[in-house]
UniProtKB/Swiss-Prot annotation:
Protein location: Cytoplasm, Cytoskeleton, Cilium axoneme; Cytoplasm, Cytoskeleton, Flagellum axoneme
Organs and tissues of expression: Expressed in choroid plexus (at protein level). Expressed by motile ciliated cells in choroid plexus.
Biased composition, class Polar residues, residue ranges: 84-99
GO cellular component, one term: ciliary base
Source organism of the structure: Gallus gallus (Chicken)
Chief location category: cytoplasm
Region (Disordered): 79-99
InterPro entries: CFAP144
GO terms assigned for molecular function: microtubule binding
UniProt record similarity statement: Belongs to the CFAP144 family.
Keywords for this protein: Cell projection, Cilium, Cytoplasm, Cytoskeleton, Flagellum
Superkingdom in the source lineage: Eukaryota
Protein name, per record: Cilia- and flagella-associated protein 144
Function per UniProt: Microtubule inner protein (MIP) part of the dynein-decorated doublet microtubules (DMTs) in cilia axoneme, which is required for motile cilia beating.
Length: 131
């Protein structure tokens, strides 16, 4: 054995073989091969049900038209379901049609996006493009 802080001798082939033999012997001692399997009678068995959303299990079932109509009706937005708003929150934005027609030639009320040097600089992520 080398002294503390000294150089360690590299292991020779006999020493490496002895280490490998010892390792394999310990592994084989701890491993156990099971070839027969059975159900534990003391543990309760749970039944596995089918997946509810699987399409291949529900192919033969006919679709109920009334039920589908109820589902589709419930998924509609409130303006299509009801003639008037049902809550105070629904009153805001119930009428979605604009009160006046938008005149795109009138510059007082129409502000389109413009491309300037500053907007192109910020759209590029703050880095000016080299041209």
């Amino acid at each position: 054995m080398a002294a503390r802080g000294g150089k360690k001798e590299p292991p020779d082939a006999v020493h490496l073989n002895r280490l490998l033999y010892e390792r394999v012997r310990k592994e084989l001692r701890c491993q156990r091969l099971h070839t027969e399997h059975s159900i534990n009678p003391l543990r309760p068995v749970h039944a596995v049900t089918q997946k509810p959303m699987s399409w291949h299990d529900n192919i033969e079932e006919p679709a109920d038209a009334r039920f589908l109509n109820i589902i589709h009706q419930a998924a509609l937005e409130p303006t299509k379901k009801y003639s008037e708003p049902q809550t105070e929150s629904q009153e805001i934005g119930w009428n979605t049609t604009p009160l006046t027609d938008v005149d795109r030639t009138d510059r007082r009320l129409f502000f389109p996006r413009r491309r300037t040097e500053i907007t192109m600089h910020s759209a590029a992520g703050g880095h000016p493009k080299k041209q």
